[in-house]
Amino acid sequence: MANIEKDHQKVILVGDGAVGSYYAYALTLQGIAQEVGIVDIFKEKTQGDAIDLSDALAFTSPKKIYAAEYSDAKDADVVVITAGAPQKPGETRLDLVSKNLKILKTIVDPIVESGFNGIFLVAANPVDILTYATWKLSGFPKERVIGSGTSLDSARFRKDIAEMVNVDARSVHAYIMGEHGDTEFPVWSHANIGGIKISEWVKAHPEVKEEELVKIFESVRDAAYTIINLKGATFYGIGTALARITKAILDDENAVLPLSVFMDGQYGLNDIFIGSPAVINRSGITNILEIPLTDHEMESMHKSAKQLKDIVTKAFEELDIETRQ
C-alpha cells in the first residue's frame, strides 16, 4: 500500500457524477483521508466541485481536494470507481453491462499504468460484474479488488426492520446477500435485534406480522427503482456506504461488511464476485465469512451467482475485451 504506513491517506475518485460527488462530500464531512483527487471527463465541473468541497474544510478537518488525472493514482491507497452510465427509470442494473464494461476499460488501464498499487473499490453498476471486470482488467490480487456489493441493501434492510420494531438501526444485525440487484436475498436465518433472532422477536411481539417482513425485503430490493423514479438517481445512501468502506480500509479496522468479493470455494461458488459479509482492512479482504445458510437461502445464493456468471461470460465474449488475467 502506498501511503497508509506514513499516516497520509490518499484516495482517487473516478467519476464526479451524483454518486461520486456525494462520496467526496461524505469523505470531507467525516474527515476521512488527507488527500482526495477527483478524476472525470468533465474537467470544469470537477474543478468546481473540488473548490466547493475545499470551502468546507474550515468546518471539518485539513484535507487536500483537487481535480486529478489518472497519473495521480500512482501513490494512492484506494481508487474508487463510480463512473459509468447511470441507471434510467425502468432499466435494471444488468441492462448497463455492455455500456459500463467499455467505460471501465478506459479507466482501469490508465490507473494500472500509473503504477497504482493500492485497493480498487468499485461502485458503478452492475457492481458485481464490474468488480469482476476490474479484477480481470487490472491483474490485481482478488483481495485488493472490492465492490460495494450489498452494503447499501443491508443498510436499507436494517433501517426498515428497525422502523418496524421501533429500535435503533445500529442495534439490528441483518444481511442482504447475493447480487446487488434483482436476485439478492435476505438472510432471515441470522437476522437479529440486539441478539434476539427475528423469528423469536415476532413470537414475542404479536403486533409484528410475518407478512410485514416479506414486504420489508421487497421494499429493500426495489428501493433503487423507487428512488430513481422519484428523483432520477440514488446517491446519498451509496455515497455514505462507500465512505464507510473507505474508512474501514484506511483505518485498518478489520471490519465485517457485506461487500462484493471473489468466491474461491465459499458457498460452493468459484470465479465470481458476489455479495457476502467479509473482513476488510488496509490489505483488502482478509476473510470471507461463510455464514451457515438455510437450504432456501443457499439456493437463492446459487441462483443469484448463476445469473451473474451467465451475464459476465456472455458480455466478455461479445465485447472481446483483453484482460490481464
UniProtKB/Swiss-Prot annotation:
Keyword annotations of the record: Allosteric enzyme, Cytoplasm, NAD, Oxidoreductase, Phosphoprotein
Activity regulation, short description: Allosterically activated by fructose 1,6-bisphosphate (FBP).
Chemical reaction(s) catalysed: (S)-lactate + NAD(+) = pyruvate + NADH + H(+)
Active-site residues (renumbered): H180 (proton acceptor)
Residues noted as binding NAD(+) in the record, renumbered to the chain: V19, D40, K45, Y70, G84, A85, T106, A123, A124, N125, S148
GO cellular component, one term: cytoplasm
Gene Ontology MF, one: L-lactate dehydrogenase activity
Described purpose of this protein according to its UniProt entry: Catalyzes the conversion of lactate to pyruvate.
Quaternary state and interactors: Homotetramer.
Protein name: L-lactate dehydrogenase
